[in-house]
């Protein structure tokens, strides 16, 4: 079965004492996701993650904290394996204007302890598994 490589990010910011996570959803779709997408030829993993975050969330003022890990799953059509490399980014940017003109993405910030249902279960697991690491950034 073919495999593709994707990259994305967990983007966090703090407002007062609450830590928020950026999630996106496409118009007409009920569930939120972390911004992510395919690696393009010639890009580093981090460059691809930053590009996808800007395209889907409109966030570009990003400080890399580190790599969170790789999640592997079947794609939506269950015909291809996808390995997604996730990075943790810190931002002070609140508003974003997604740059992907082919899709209608909406950015929303959610408190880390009040996340909505996330379409891809491994993304929700990734956030929960790294919760303490994320919170330590702001101590």
What are these regions (language model features)?
Residues 20, 49, 133-134:
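Generic secondary-structure boundary signal with a strong preference for alpha-helix termini
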Residues 139:
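Catalytic cores of nucleic-acid ligases and guanylyltransferases
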Residues 1-4, 13, 74, 112, ...:
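Class I (Rossmann-like) S-adenosyl-L-methionine-dependent methyltransferase catalytic domain
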Residues 1-34:
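N-terminal strand-loop-strand
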Residues 37-66, 70-126:
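Unchanged
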